[in-house]
């Protein structure tokens, strides 16, 4: 489940900005 504060693509949270989850995740940093 993605929350708006989970704006990272790490193994623990698996979320990205815009509440888009791991499938569409692009790791930028």
Curated annotation (Swiss-Prot):
<keyword id="KW-0528">Neurotoxin</keyword>
<keyword id="KW-1220">Voltage-gated potassium channel impairing toxin</keyword>
<keyword id="KW-0800">Toxin</keyword>
<keyword id="KW-0632">Potassium channel impairing toxin</keyword>
<feature type="disulfide bond">
    <location>
        <begin position="15"/>
        <end position="25"/>
    </location>
</feature>
<comment type="similarity">
    <text>Belongs to the neurotoxin 30 (phrixotoxin) family.</text>
</comment>
<dbReference type="Pfam" id="PF07740">
    <property type="entry name" value="Toxin_12"/>
</dbReference>
<feature type="disulfide bond">
    <location>
        <begin position="2"/>
        <end position="16"/>
    </location>
</feature>
<keyword id="KW-0964">Secreted</keyword>
<dbReference type="InterPro" id="IPR011696">
    <property type="entry name" value="Huwentoxin-1"/>
</dbReference>
<comment type="function">
    <text>Potent and specific blocker of Kv4.2/KCND2 (IC(50)=5 nM) and Kv4.3/KCND3 (IC(50)=28 nM) potassium channels. Acts by altering the gating properties of these channels. Also shows moderate inhibition on human voltage-gated sodium channel Nav1.7/SCN9A activation (IC(50)=423 nM).</text>
</comment>
<feature type="modified residue" description="Isoleucine amide">
    <location>
        <position position="29"/>
    </location>
</feature>
<dbReference type="GO" id="GO:0090729">
    <property type="term" value="F:toxin activity"/>
</dbReference>
<dbReference type="GO" id="GO:0005576">
    <property type="term" value="C:extracellular region"/>
</dbReference>
<dbReference type="GO" id="GO:0015459">
    <property type="term" value="F:potassium channel regulator activity"/>
</dbReference>
<keyword id="KW-0872">Ion channel impairing toxin</keyword>
<keyword id="KW-0027">Amidation</keyword>
<protein>
    <recommendedName>
        <fullName>Kappa-theraphotoxin-Ps1a</fullName>
    </recommendedName>
</protein>
<dbReference type="GO" id="GO:0008200">
    <property type="term" value="F:ion channel inhibitor activity"/>
</dbReference>
<feature type="disulfide bond">
    <location>
        <begin position="9"/>
        <end position="21"/>
    </location>
</feature>
<keyword id="KW-0960">Knottin</keyword>
<keyword id="KW-1015">Disulfide bond</keyword>
């Amino acid at each position: 489940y993605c929350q708006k504060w989970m704006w990272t693509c790490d193994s623990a949270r698996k979320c990205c900005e815009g509440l888009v989850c791991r499938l569409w995740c692009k790791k930028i940093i």
